C-alpha cells in the first residue's frame, strides 16, 4: 500500500494548470477578493481519478503545492476514516469541506469552490427577511447573468432569464451541511451553486476556469443585489 505521507510526486509538476499548482494560485486570488479571509473557504479540483483539496484551518493565501491533499476518486463521503487519501501532508488537517466537494464531483463537476463572501452572506439575510427561510435568491434582467449556465448541456442563461440559487441553513460543523446541500442539488438540478445562510456559498463548474468565472459572476450579482436593495430597486422585473 502507498504511504500517503510520502506520495509527493502527486503534487510536483512544472505545469501551471496542474491542480497542485492551480489551487494555491486560486486561493491567493480569492484572498484578495475577501472570499477566504481568516482561513475560511476552500477549493478542490478533480483530475481523472484524483481529487486535489486545499487543507483546512490554514491561511489560504499562504498555501503551497506541498500542502495539498490528494484523494482517490471515487471515495466514500462518510465516515471520514473511509476516505481514500493517497497523499496527506504531515501536520495539516483535511478540509472540512471535503464531503461537500465530493457531492459536486459526484454530479460531474471538475472544480468546486467554497467562499465566505460577505455579499453572499448578505443576500441570504435579505432573502430570509423578504421571503422567509424557504426563499431562494432570484434576479433577472442583469447582463452578468449570462456568465451562469442554464444547466448541464443547456448553454448559458440569457439576459431575460431568471437566475435562481437555493439557500440552505448553516450548521455548527461544515460537514453537517452535506445532506442539505445534496437535497438542494436534487431540488434545483440545474444549479451550479448553493448559498449557505450566514456562512457563504458553494460553487462548482465543469472545469477550474468555469468554476472560477461562475463564482466571480455570482459575487458580482450578489453585490449588485445588495446595492439595488439599498436603492429600493427590485431584483425581479
Curated annotation (Swiss-Prot):
<keyword id="KW-0486">Methionine biosynthesis</keyword>
<feature type="active site" description="Proton donor/acceptor">
    <location>
        <position position="143"/>
    </location>
</feature>
<dbReference type="InterPro" id="IPR027514">
    <property type="entry name" value="Salvage_MtnB_euk"/>
</dbReference>
<comment type="similarity">
    <text>Belongs to the aldolase class II family. MtnB subfamily.</text>
</comment>
<keyword id="KW-0456">Lyase</keyword>
<dbReference type="InterPro" id="IPR017714">
    <property type="entry name" value="MethylthioRu-1-P_deHdtase_MtnB"/>
</dbReference>
<comment type="function">
    <text>Catalyzes the dehydration of methylthioribulose-1-phosphate (MTRu-1-P) into 2,3-diketo-5-methylthiopentyl-1-phosphate (DK-MTP-1-P).</text>
</comment>
<dbReference type="Pfam" id="PF00596">
    <property type="entry name" value="Aldolase_II"/>
</dbReference>
<keyword id="KW-0963">Cytoplasm</keyword>
<protein>
    <recommendedName>
        <fullName>Methylthioribulose-1-phosphate dehydratase</fullName>
        <ecNumber>4.2.1.109</ecNumber>
    </recommendedName>
</protein>
<keyword id="KW-0028">Amino-acid biosynthesis</keyword>
<keyword id="KW-0479">Metal-binding</keyword>
<dbReference type="GO" id="GO:0008270">
    <property type="term" value="F:zinc ion binding"/>
</dbReference>
<dbReference type="GO" id="GO:0019509">
    <property type="term" value="P:L-methionine salvage from methylthioadenosine"/>
</dbReference>
<dbReference type="InterPro" id="IPR001303">
    <property type="entry name" value="Aldolase_II/adducin_N"/>
</dbReference>
<feature type="binding site">
    <location>
        <position position="114"/>
    </location>
    <ligand>
        <name>Zn(2+)</name>
    </ligand>
</feature>
<feature type="binding site">
    <location>
        <position position="97"/>
    </location>
    <ligand>
        <name>substrate</name>
    </ligand>
</feature>
<feature type="binding site">
    <location>
        <position position="199"/>
    </location>
    <ligand>
        <name>Zn(2+)</name>
    </ligand>
</feature>
<dbReference type="InterPro" id="IPR036409">
    <property type="entry name" value="Aldolase_II/adducin_N_sf"/>
</dbReference>
<keyword id="KW-0862">Zinc</keyword>
<comment type="pathway">
    <text>Amino-acid biosynthesis; L-methionine biosynthesis via salvage pathway; L-methionine from S-methyl-5-thio-alpha-D-ribose 1-phosphate: step 2/6.</text>
</comment>
<dbReference type="GO" id="GO:0005737">
    <property type="term" value="C:cytoplasm"/>
</dbReference>
<dbReference type="GO" id="GO:0046570">
    <property type="term" value="F:methylthioribulose 1-phosphate dehydratase activity"/>
</dbReference>
<feature type="binding site">
    <location>
        <position position="116"/>
    </location>
    <ligand>
        <name>Zn(2+)</name>
    </ligand>
</feature>
